[in-house]
Amino acid sequence: MSESDGAFKSPSLPPSHHAPAPMSPEKIRAPAEQMDGPVEGVIDEIETAEVQAEKESKISVQAPALHYEVPPWACEPDPAHKFQFEILKEGKLIASYDLSNRKNSTFVVIGRIKPGCDLLMEHPSISRYHCILQYGNDKMSKTGKGWHIFELGSTHGSRMNKKRLPPKQYIRTRVGFIFQFGESTRILNFVGPEEDSEPEWDCSPTEMKLRKHKKELEAKLRAAAAQEMIDDEKREKEEEGCGWGMDYGEDEKPLTTVETDAHLMEDREAYYNQDPKKALQKFFEREGFDMNFEFSEQGQGHTHKWVCSIELPVEIDGVDRAFTASATVSTSKKDAQIQCALDACRILDTYNVLRKSNTKLRMQRKTLEANDYYDEDDDLYLDRTGQLEKQREKRKQWAEEGFGHKRTETDTYESLCRKLEESKKEIIECQKHLDELSAGTKKSRTIDQGGDVLDDYIRQLEKSGGAGDDAKTKMEKSKWRQKLMAATHESQKLEKLVKIAKPAVVKGLEQLETTAANDRQAFLKKLMGVRARKEIDQTPSQGPGPSTSATLPATVAPTSTKAVEVEHEKKMTPLKVEKEIAASLDSSEIKNSLPAVDEPSSVKDEVSEETPQKEAFGSKVQKRVAQWEEELEAEKEELAKKQKLEAEEEAKKKVQRVRRRDIEKKIAGSEDYGAGVEDRDEKYSTWMPPNADQSEAKQDALRAKFAGRY
């Protein structure tokens, strides 16, 4: 290089190397302007459409084949029904996808690969073809059409309503369901018409859990019963031993099949689901037993529960088996009883003994009639409570109702009174037994005065109720209390029936009979007095001697007549009096017709003086008797009218019912303060302050009257 060269010369480049193309000022200026922004934004700005097209041409990604066959029940959805997915992220709606924008006619593909998927999800945990949403006929209900989700066996799976979906199965989806795919946090809400939504539950989630738990218990119970039957059969076979050919030709009894199908059990439950207690009562009446529930309590306060149990006498293949149904309820005692009856009906229906066929019932009725309605195991000699007779009556009634000739008993007033007396005697007997049990308990708890102080204290605690009765005494007391309660209820029922069946009594009829009898006796007494006076008057003329009545003083004669009347009243009955009156009348007439007998002159004079007096007295008696009869008839008529008026007044009182509503309206409408109150003057002060219209004189008078009081 020479010094004369004034400028620096750049070295020459090989011909194969080309100089870089000059960049446009816009491209050079862009990084300087957006240096503060994110790097991705800068890269997106730098890359042009030509560069992206060049990349796509260089990188060729071929979509894999979708291995999915459309089922035969698939169909196209109705265009009028719009279904879509709402995509939520962190509780916010970020996007939505309409299912009508699908590539296929009947299904939607959900996945991560763009060319072959309808709904594109970019999370790395989502498979290329993740799942299929297929539209078609509803396979479960066969009543409509809808969408079904089909998991394609993805690596991280899918969840519907927070439950993992099984692979390669069609699951019916409803409007309102939510979906999650892979490990993505985005939630897809399925939106559509209300007709496709799931029906609401008829119970709460807690009740659903209880139902599920109950079904599990029933399944365990059925399994345990089946296992017990198998064990019993094995035990019987082991105990049989060698038959020696004695049972040759005998037909084996068919085994009782235990029904375990849930759908069949639901159909059969319709018989006793509405009223299980009534269905169970029919079973016990048919078997001839009493339905006795046993109750017990558990816990206290908010943990208090009622436990109800009942023992079921079940005969399976000729073998008596005892099952116990129980139920625990925290609501009430009645609910526990109903639930226990429902469980008992289910157990009996499982072994097909709750409802027997008509042929078996007819054979059972004939067998009972042949055995005089007694069971084969009944022993009257050992029965001391009369329970066997009651069971026999129940069996007899049930058998007669089954044969068609139902026995109807009509109770009368006398039969009801007889039954009432018997129930009262039963109440007294039950109370007597209870008193004897209580007295025996008290006697066993008596405290000895001697001994240790600690022993006395413990006995005192036992006496006060610390220990209580033993189990046997409690059972006896409970049994007699139940009998007492049943007898008491029966007595109350019979008392009501006796009041209803009591013959009607006509008011005034008894009074009329008593008054008529009293009037008859009074009339006969008066006639007796008349007869006695006649005899007294006739006594002097019977003998030839002088008259003793004339010699007696005037003061003695009335007393003697009264004494004679009293003696005659005591000695003579009404029938005898009537006969004597008739005889006296006949004898007087006969005496008048007889010829006269010669008598002394003094006697004739006395008789001649007394005869007009006797004739006048007889006419007076007849008039008085007729007057008495008229008075009696008038009194009877007045009494009948009075009784008729009283009956009419009572009928009016019954018909005219005073309505309290009218009285309240009348009281409310009245302007008086305290109207309608009996002691109004004592409870209410009716004084009112003076009005402006009153004169000054009245106001001054009132001020002077109440000065110093107010």
From Swiss-Prot:
Coiled coil: 206-240, 409-440, 471-502, 613-661
Keywords: Coiled coil
Domain FHA: 108-165
Record-linked CDD domains: DSRM_Kanadaptin (cd19856), FHA_Kanadaptin (cd22677)
Biased composition annotated in UniProt, kind: Polar residues: 538-560
InterPro entries: Cell_Proc_Reg/RNA_Proc, dsRBD_dom, FHA_dom, SMAD_FHA_dom_sf
Annotated region described as Disordered, given as residue ranges: 1-40, 230-250, 535-560, 591-619, 671-710
Protein name: Uncharacterized protein ZK632.2
Molecular function GO terms recorded: mRNA binding
Biased composition (Low complexity): 15-25
Keyword rRNA-binding included in the entry's annotation: no
